Design a protein with these regions (language model features):
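All-alpha RGS (Regulator of G-protein Signaling) helical domain and cognate RGS-like helical scaffolds
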Residues: 2-159
Length: 159
């Protein structure tokens, strides 16, 4: 038991005013880097969705689009592997953007190309706030998506 003395009383009063962790106040906010990673997961889900819908609408494009879709599925797996699910926050599992597929196969390819270009820009925008290993992953995915833009441009030119 502490005895009240000139040195222990101020210490006791100071310590009793300290707050501990707010255990019951809910989960802590999600860190910005984790938010970026979750946005990257959602972006890949959106690209996968538009590829699947385009291939369902224009089956003649399957052979050209299937390899690009497979790369996006690999990107998604690599991104998800980096997610440590934060308390109170679920890892995205469904597309959030579901645009209508263009009315012709050439227009659908152009729509995919534009989506890929937007994805490149978004991935590059994530670099500044990312850890070195995440920045490397984002840059790798952006590079892959840039090659998709070129491949889709070539396919559009042949249409």
């Amino acid at each position: 038991m502490l005895a009240a003395s000139p040195t222990t009383l101020p210490l006791f009063l100071a310590l009793s005013a300290c707050k501990g962790p707010a255990v019951l106040s809910g989960p802590p906010p999600v860190a910005p880097q984790t938010q970026m990673l979750l946005h990257a997961v959602t972006a890949e889900l959106n690209l996968i969705w538009i590829y699947n819908k385009t291939m369902a609408e224009y089956s003649g494009l399957d052979s050209a689009l299937a390899p690009l879709l497979a790369e996006h599925q690999a990107h998604l797996a690599r991104l998800r592997a980096r997610v440590i699910e934060p308390p109170g926050k679920k890892t995205p599992s469904a597309a959030t953007a579901r645009p209508a597929i263009a009315g012709t196969s050439a227009a659908a390819l152009a729509q995919l190309r534009d989506a890929e270009q937007a994805a490149v820009t978004a991935q590059l925008g994530r670099l500044a706030g990312a850890s070195p290993s995440l920045a490397q992953l984002y840059a790798s995915i952006a590079t892959s998506e840039a090659t998709h833009v070129t491949a889709l441009d070539g396919r559009i030119a042949r249409s």
